[in-house]
Amino acid sequence: MEMARAHVFIRGKVQGVFFRQSMKEVAMRNGVKGWVRNRSDGKTVEAVLEGPRDAVMKVLEWARIGPPGARVEDIEVQWEEYKGEFKDFKILPTV
């Protein structure tokens, strides 16, 4: 099983629409670990996803649409070396 790590920036109407909580649920359902947080610009959500490549891809596919009420305008994915550093999936404070 190939493991993967993606550093993701999702832009658009993605704050105030339960994006972080929804992403956490989707990630946990797919066995993906990492974190998600809002950025202080008010229009960006940032996440790091780690897990089996197929599972990470499922979360990324979901993130292109997001939860009801979201309007994703752009998604930037930076593939990084898998580190296996997370035990679960967390919602972190805004930066």
UniProtKB/Swiss-Prot annotation:
UniProt GO MF annotations: acylphosphatase activity
Gene that this sequence comes from: acyP
E.C. number(s) listed in UniProt: 3.6.1.7
Pfam families xref list: Acylphosphatase
SUPFAM superfamilies per UniProt: Acylphosphatase/BLUF domain-like (SSF54975)
Domain Acylphosphatase-like: 5-93
Protein's UniProt keywords contain Hydrolase: yes
Residues forming the catalytic site: R20, N38
Domain of life: Archaea
Protein name: Acylphosphatase
Family: Belongs to the acylphosphatase family.
Gene3D superfamilies (UniProt xref): 3.30.70.100
Keywords linked to the UniProt accession: Hydrolase
Known catalytic reactions: an acyl phosphate + H2O = a carboxylate + phosphate + H(+)
Enzyme's top EC category: hydrolase
Species of provenance: Pyrobaculum aerophilum (strain ATCC 51768 / DSM 7523 / JCM 9630 / CIP 104966 / NBRC 100827 / IM2)
